[in-house]
Amino acid sequence: VSAVYSVIFAYRIFTDLLGLARTEARSLTLLLFSFAYIMLSMMVPDHFGLSLPWLLLTVLLAGRCFKRGTAFKPWQQAVLFFFTAGLTLTNGLKSCLAFLFAAPRRVWRWRSVLSVVLPLALLFGIRQYQQFAYEQPMKERVAMMIEIKKQKDPNFGKGDAKIVAWREKQNGTAIDKDNLLLQWSDISTPRLPSVIHNLMGESLILHSQHLLEDVQNNRPVFVAYDQMVFYVVEGLIALLFIIGVWYGRRSRLMWLLLSWFAFDMLMHVGFGFGLNEVYIMTAHWAFIIPIAIGFAIRHLSGTKRELVVSAVSALGAWMFFYNLAFIVGYCVD
């Protein structure tokens, strides 16, 4: 269901908001769903797969507000914020940015404020109930089971020290391990290799070595591609993205997307949250790439436009079948 609605919303963004032809919209939609961890997010029951359609829906509705010169209705804000923030608070912040971009003044009216505050209070109540009704009793049962196991087997759990040491090394050095917020930071993992190999690498094109391994268990933080062609493709996508941002620099929709992108990059690359496995968060930001490329296509004409669309189609088809082959092979093995 998430995959179907993600395709529909992405396609409508390209046609309704950017005014692209159907063939061009299909090419960009294919490119989006050829990204490795977009494909995986649609296959795995996790919140990343649910985040994508809600973020795309937010973009679609925001774009329509921009075109009409209207604001989000309070009930729309309440629904969007409840479901986006319910998946992850960072998504809720992105929804708030969309509300702000649509109507910078009206967003501070009491109805608009309540449309965010009330869902937030409801989410807090649900979180508290979940913690005391399910999580805490489960932790107590697990602790009891571990204690019983240790009584029967004195050696039980002694090997965990090696696992903990490995994970501490993989997760990098935090600014302050005792601080509730700063413990999620990472100031030791190199940024440039993270961008090349993980953010713009594994997120889009799977590595053949250490295929789909977990960085918390056995995967190195950085894995290099076997051939230079993968870095060329990675660079081409980045170049098309930058060109698209330039062509869309006068669009309010582009600036909204850039605010989302800047927030994610500040959180992951700057603060270091999840930097060692940043590719698993691809569904939160990678859809901005084909939308930006769509701005470039919209402003081009003639041969240049045809060349860009052809390049996007070729990249999308190649990446789709390349990543799909590895995913299917992994599942079969």
Protein language model annotation of sequence segments:
Residues 11-34, 255:
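Transmembrane-helix signature of polytopic, membrane-embedded enzymes
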Residues 43-49:
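Short acidic/glycine- and proline-prone juxtamembrane loop motifs at membrane-interface regions
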Residues 71-103, 117-121, 314-315:
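Membrane-interface alpha helices of multi-pass inner-membrane proteins
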Residues 26-28, 250-270:
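Transmembrane alpha-helix segments characteristic
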Residues 93-120, 136-148:
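Perimembrane helix-loop-helix junctions
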Residues 50-67, 288, 292:
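Specific aromatic-rich, kink-prone transmembrane helix
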Residues 1, 161-242, 254-257:
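Lumenal/periplasmic acceptor-binding loop at the mouth of the active site in multi-pass
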Residues 2-18, 239-243:
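Transmembrane-helix motifs of polytopic, lipid-linked glycan transferases
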